[in-house]
Design a protein with these regions (language model features):
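Aromatic- and glycine-rich beta-strand/loop motifs that create alpha-glucan
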Residues: 1-26
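Alpha-helical transmembrane segments of multi-pass membrane transporters/permeases
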Residues: 20, 167-182, 186
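Hydrophobic core positions of alpha-helical segments in small-molecule transporters
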Residues: 20-24, 104-105, 173-176, 240
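Secretory targeting signals
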Residues: 24-74, 104-170, 227, 231-234
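Terminal transmembrane helical anchor/hairpin motif
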Residues: 38-55, 174, 182-258
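Transmembrane alpha-helical segments in integral membrane proteins
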Residues: 68-84, 89, 159-171, 240-258
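Helix-loop-helix units of permease transmembrane domains in multi-pass membrane transporters
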Residues: 78-111
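Hydrophobic alpha-helical transmembrane segments of integral membrane proteins
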Residues: 99-122, 189-207
């Protein structure tokens, strides 16, 4: 399996898109840092320590939540379209590797990039915040970044199913992921009116609720009093996303085998 993962990483290494993944980690921290430095925003935070918590929450809770599904979708399209574009499905049948093993290697690579992107976004936030804020609590923020990388990637797998199913162009895959991110953010603005089961059924809003609740437990200045009844525990979040991931991977495996026939 490690050799398969290494092989998939080597394939992506040839793509010029990958360096952009790391650069995109600065896409939200930089403008949000300037936004946090405005007098109107400074009035909301009593000191520079709390201000940094606010910056971290906005970057991870809005920027990463929006951008990472798009990044995962594009990388997934690259991974799953390579064999189709190069017409190598027949060649793959001659090697002693099952399609399920190949699928798992590709999925693991998606999770690796999901975690890397979140860690890069976290470090970008630290770098930007260090100029005007007091940096603290890095151990917890590091843990949250890793968890968000795993959770958001798992929550994006249903979209990967659609990417593999339609098997269209990269542009179509990007548009599909952008629509998914926008739809998720739209749902998040309706948390107060939507039923609990619907909020938990949608992966990205579920992750957002978990992140907000977990950050509040660790002293972040977030007003989530109106959402207390629908905030899931870590166990509930892992359980729900785990079921979604298993179903999605099974569907991806089925569709991938079918496309190779």
């Amino acid at each position: 399996m490690l050799k398969l993962i290494k092989c998939e990483l080597m394939k992506l290494k040839r793509k010029k898109f990958i360096p952009l993944v790391f650069l995109s980690a600065f896409l939200f921290p930089v403008p949000i840092t300037f936004l946090m430095a405005t007098p109107r925003m400074l009035e909301r935070y009593p000191n520079k320590t709390v201000l940094f918590d606010g910056l971290f929450n906005m970057v991870m809770g809005y920027g990463v939540i929006f951008l990472l599904p798009c990044v995962i979708g594009v990388i997934a399209a690259m991974l799953f379209f390579m064999e189709r574009d190069n017409d190598t499905f027949k060649n793959l049948r001659t090697i002693p590797v099952t399609s399920t093993q190949m699928i798992m290697a590709k999925i693991i690579v998606l999770f690796i990039f999901g975690v890397i992107f979140c860690l890069a976004s976290m470090f970008a936030t630290v770098i930007c915040g260090s100029f005007s804020m007091e940096i603290h609590g890095l151990a917890y923020k590091l843990l949250v970044a890793i968890e968000l990388g795993i959770f958001i990637t798992a929550g994006t797998l249903p979209v990967v199913v659609l990417v593999v199913f339609f098997s269209r162009t990269y542009i179509f895959s990007i548009l599909l992921c952008v629509f998914y991110s926008v739809a998720s953010l739209t749902v998040e603005t309706l948390f107060g009116t939507l039923p609990k089961w619907l909020c938990w059924l949608l992966p990205i809003p579920l992750t957002t609720l978990w992140g907000a609740g977990d950050m509040v437990k660790h002293g972040f200045p977030l007003n989530v009093a109106a959402l207390e009844k629908i905030i899931p525990s870590t166990f509930q979040t892992v359980f729900i996303l785990g079921i979604m991931a298993v179903i999605s991977i099974s569907l991806i495996d089925f569709l991938y085998k079918k496309s190779g026939e």
